[in-house]
Amino acid sequence: MSSSSATSGVVGDRGVPCKCVCGLSVTVFTSKSQDNSGRPFFRCISKRDAKTWTNNRNGHLFKWVEEAVFEEVEDALPRLAVIANEINKAKSEALELKAMIQEILEEALINKMQIRRNWCGLKLGFVWLFVITIVIVYVLFGQDNEKKLVAGY
């Protein structure tokens, strides 16, 4: 096996290949050459027989596994950076929402205390109204039987 790492016939294919340009699937083989003994590589299944392998790949896929994995990692790093950025944005939004919730809870507590104060004031107002009504009724109708309300005098 040659130590070349070109992906013959697959222009722009990065990462772990799943199909050859001929349309057949790709499988992993292990190199038995002296230069790359035991080194795994991807190869088109049409080239199963090692005797048909030549330096001229006849347009079929050949790629070393570690190069494919390296390309996958290289391609994943920007996506990981984007995901990390999104996580940081989500964390800051969560902190903002927690602060907003805290403000709303504080406002609710203040409003609850104001409602209690107003309710007590309303009760006190009704008590005074009741007392004044009783006093007026007593003054008008509760004094001596001799004094009666006479119209005009």
Curated annotation (Swiss-Prot):
The keyword Chloroplast applies. It is found in: Plastid, Chloroplast membrane. Keywords: Chloroplast, Membrane, Metal-binding, Plastid, Transit peptide, Transmembrane, Transmembrane helix, Zinc, Zinc-finger. Residues 1-43 form a transit peptide. It is a single-pass membrane protein. PROSITE patterns: ZF_GRF. Zn(2+) binds at C20, C22, C44, H60. InterPro entries: Znf_GRF (IPR010666). Its main location: plastid. The chain crosses the membrane at residues 121-141. One of its GO terms (cellular component) is chloroplast membrane. A zinc finger (GRF-type) spans 20-68. GO terms for molecular function: zinc ion binding. PANTHER family: ZINC ION-BINDING PROTEIN. This is Uncharacterized protein At1g43920, Chloroplastic. It comes from Arabidopsis thaliana (Mouse-ear cress).
